[in-house]
């Protein structure tokens, strides 16, 4: 019995050493240590041995089985390490090869213009105020001197959700909200960028969703001359140092007096061209002095405080600046269009 155990050990260790992969090694494990293997058979046949030999043969059988098990584990670890090394060799990276170029995106032209305008006014000391796109009727209309029954409240012009809730039609509600937070104490100096919504038919110059940037300054002794100086500086920074502006009388419910603001044409220098339609001037925004009713509803004493407000459409400015003839290009995600602005 002893000789058989020693021979089994020798054969098992020899086959373990010859195994070239994990499958072959597992076959050796099953052959020698499995339920039907020779080691198990020896242990089962110990009942036929004389009582005095059983302890010796049992101890030897366990010793042989332990030696085979240790050899299997050592060989398995070696084969697994060799497999890892083969995979690493096959997947080796040549660090001297040139990298694959990564296609980078670029800011959307509309985003570019909005950020440029924001940076310009932040440089003048303004802060950016943002608010909800789903707005109450009060802040969208009443707080801005648009009482019940005003044409701007027509269901055909605005996206109403309920009688008192709608998608904001301008970013002016943030002006009213900000003035309320100041509790009648100036100064207030903000710009309000964001998306707005109106019931409009989409075409080359109109969209049911577009962006606005509005500005507001409230303090003691604010005059129309302050408004003009601010907008002249804005026009020169955005369209070039040689630009001038002009005011034309207009009407907005929340400002009095109100003006339309034109900038001298940056394409023809005022001589007349297709961009300015031969006039030498391009309309870019609306503005005016904050209506006393708006100040009073926000908690400001209109006899002590005055202010000016202005509003512009970044889409129009981007169209003028980049020569874009259709507002729908901004929203159609056409890569052929967007790639034109990689180096603008």
Swiss-Prot record:
Keyword Protein biosynthesis annotated: yes
Chain sites annotated for binding Mg(2+): 256
Xref: Gene3D superfamilies: Bira Bifunctional Protein, Domain 2 (3.30.930.10)
Listed cofactors: Mg(2+)
Disulfide bonds: none
BP-aspect Gene Ontology terms: phenylalanyl-tRNA aminoacylation
UniProt-listed PANTHER family: PHENYLALANINE--TRNA LIGASE, MITOCHONDRIAL (PTHR11538:SF41), PHENYLALANYL-TRNA SYNTHETASE (PTHR11538)
Family that this chain belongs to: Belongs to the class-II aminoacyl-tRNA synthetase family. Phe-tRNA synthetase alpha subunit type 1 subfamily.
Oligomer and partners: Tetramer of two alpha and two beta subunits.
Protein name (database record): Phenylalanine--tRNA ligase alpha subunit
């Amino acid at each position: 019995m002893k000789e058989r155990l020693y021979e089994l050990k020798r054969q098992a260790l020899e086959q373990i050493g010859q195994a070239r992969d994990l499958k072959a090694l597992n076959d050796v494990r099953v052959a020698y240590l499995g339920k039907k293997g020779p080691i198990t058979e020896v242990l089962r046949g110990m009942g036929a041995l004389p009582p005095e030999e059983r302890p010796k043969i049992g101890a030897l059988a366990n010793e042989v089985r332990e030696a085979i098990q240790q050899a299997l584990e050592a060989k398995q670890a070696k084969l697994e390490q060799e497999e890892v090394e083969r995979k690493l060799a096959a997947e080796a990276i040549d660090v001297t090869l040139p990298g694959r170029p990564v296609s980078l995106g670029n800011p959307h032209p509309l985003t570019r213009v909005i950020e440029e305008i924001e940076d310009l006014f932040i440089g003048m000391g303004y802060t950016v105020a943002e608010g909800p796109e789903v707005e109450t009727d009060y802040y969208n209309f009443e707080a801005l001197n648009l009482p019940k029954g005003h044409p701007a409240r027509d269901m055909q012009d605005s996206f109403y959700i309920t009688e008192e809730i709608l998608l904001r039609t301008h970013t002016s509600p943030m002006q009213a909200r900000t003035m309320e937070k100041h509790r009648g104490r100036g100064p207030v100096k903000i710009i309000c960028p964001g998306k707005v919504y109106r019931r409009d038919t989409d075409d080359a110059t109109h969209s049911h969703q577009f962006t606005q940037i509005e500005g507001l300054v409230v303090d003691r002794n604010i005059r129309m001359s302050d408004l003009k100086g601010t907008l002249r500086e804005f026009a020169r920074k955005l369209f070039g140092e040689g630009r001038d502006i002009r005011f034309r009388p207009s009407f907005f419910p929340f400002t009095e007096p109100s003006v339309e603001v034109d900038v001298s044409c940056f394409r023809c220098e005022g001589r007349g061209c297709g961009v300015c339609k031969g006039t030498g001037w391009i309309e870019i925004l609306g503005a005016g002095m904050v209506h006393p009713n708006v100040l009073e509803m926000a908690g400001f004493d209109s006899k002590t405080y005055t202010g000016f407000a202005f509003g512009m459409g970044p889409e129009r400015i981007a169209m003028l600046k980049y020569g874009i003839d259709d507002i729908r290009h901004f929203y159609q995600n056409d890569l052929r269009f967007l790639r034109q602005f990689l180096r603008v």
